[in-house]
């Protein structure tokens, strides 16, 4: 999954893709580099972000989604916490809704039920962020949300769960979560992880956020060996190659 932020305050893109024509060209490049889907966001979710209005978020997304649909660029995912934005995006041909809030909008499940789209459910309990997290607690929280979705008519086969790296716990805890990710496979949903350029990688990289792609590729390759289905990244070409190496290693191990 390639990342395309059309926000002026992205933590690593610095507003490079706010102009619709530049954003569409970047979407084309991400697919050319090997992305299976491109995730477009109109509201920054970096630490300390300032929420934007529904209209402002849609004004950023609409021209890009319309142009992508017109040019046959896809499949497209939209990164939003708002059910109304999700509904409008689906009307524009979006295939997946990526919700970092973990169903905080009470109308989101209804919007999903009315479509056949995919949905990314992130572990993101509301309230104060703690430094640590238990994989057992994460499992229970996600299981509850999956049950809510099922009761609303959204099948688990349409859902990817995301452990929320960089969102719901301290920097050091990201490493522990990654080490224990296989425990989440028992939930029956696919698994998506977004490690790209995040702050926990600064513990092993001296590069600024915009240049943490080598570290991102390394952790993405490791994730591929743990049963992760999708990695959400900025530098698709580099990560695609790293994951291909990991996949070959896993295949060789299974043959042996």
Model regions: which residues?
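Active-site-adjacent loop and "lid" segments of alpha/beta metabolic enzymes
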Residues: 11-29, 45-69, 73, 83-84, ...
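Short beta-strands and strand-loop turn motifs
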Residues: 7, 38-42, 121-123, 160-165, ...
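Short acidic capping loops at alpha-helix termini that bridge into adjacent secondary structure
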Residues: 155-159
């Amino acid at each position: 999954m390639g990342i395309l932020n059309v926000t002026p305050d992205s933590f690593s893109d610095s507003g490079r893709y706010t102009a619709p024509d530049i954003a569409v060209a970047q979407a084309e490049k991400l697919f050319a580099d090997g992305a299976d889907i491109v995730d477009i966001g109109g509201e920054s979710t970096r630490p300390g972000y300032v929420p934007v209005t529904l209209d402002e978020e849609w004004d950023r997304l609409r021209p890009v989604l319309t142009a992508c649909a017109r040019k046959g660029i896809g499949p497209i995912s939209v990164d939003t916490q708002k059910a109304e934005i999700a509904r409008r995006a689906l009307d524009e041909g979006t295939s997946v809704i990526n919700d970092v809030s973990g169903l905080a909008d009470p109308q989101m499940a209804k919007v999903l039920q009315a479509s056949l789209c995919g949905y990314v459910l992130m572990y993101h309990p509301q309230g104060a962020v703690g430094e640590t997290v238990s994989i057992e607690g994460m499992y229970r929280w996600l299981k509850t949300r999956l049950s809510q979705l099922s009761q609303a008519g959204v099948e688990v086969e349409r859902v990817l769960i995301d452990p929320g790296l960089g969102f719901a716990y301290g920097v050091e805890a990201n490493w522990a979560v990654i080490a224990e990710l296989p425990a989440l496979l028992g939930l029956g949903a696919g698994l998506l992880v977004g490690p790209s350029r995040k702050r926990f990688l600064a513990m092993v990289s001296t590069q600024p956020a915009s240049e943490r792609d080598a570290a991102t590729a390394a952790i993405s390759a490791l994730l591929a060996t743990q049963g992760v289905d999708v990695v959400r990244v900025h530098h698709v070409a580099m990560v695609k190659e790293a994951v291909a190496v990991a996949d070959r290693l896993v295949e060789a191990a299974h043959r042996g």
